[in-house]
Amino acid sequence: MLNNYRAFLFMKEEVFNKVLERVSELSEIASDKILKCNQEECVDARYALIAVLSERMNDRQISEVSGWSIQLVNKARNNFHERCKFRWGLKELYKELCTFAT
């Protein structure tokens, strides 16, 4: 049972890393900045990353593979669409990511 969970988590980590790489490419922001930096464009990229991941993972799983708290993941997911209303670049980044994710 534990081995199955480890395999499942490894698969989720692969998805996380692929999507993070794509977010980094499209946003032209280094992956490490997306993960930790609090500049507005980095936060936008992080929100887009979480929005895409939340289509395939729950908040706990995203938290486990990213190292972010569940509260951060939940806040980003819940506030994503509101933030898109005021951040044109975030909306465009998300559209590009959705074509990649399908």
Protein language model annotation of sequence segments:
Residues 25-39:
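Short, Lys/Arg-enriched N-terminal segment that forms or immediately precedes the first helix
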Residues 42-57:
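Short, amphipathic alpha-helical "recognition" segments used to contact nucleic acids or chromatin
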Residues 54, 77-78, 84:
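DNA major-groove recognition helix of helix-turn-helix
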Residues 61-65:
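Short alpha-helical "recognition helix" segments of helix-turn-helix
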Residues 83-102:
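Short Lys/Arg-enriched helix C-cap and helix-to-coil transition segments
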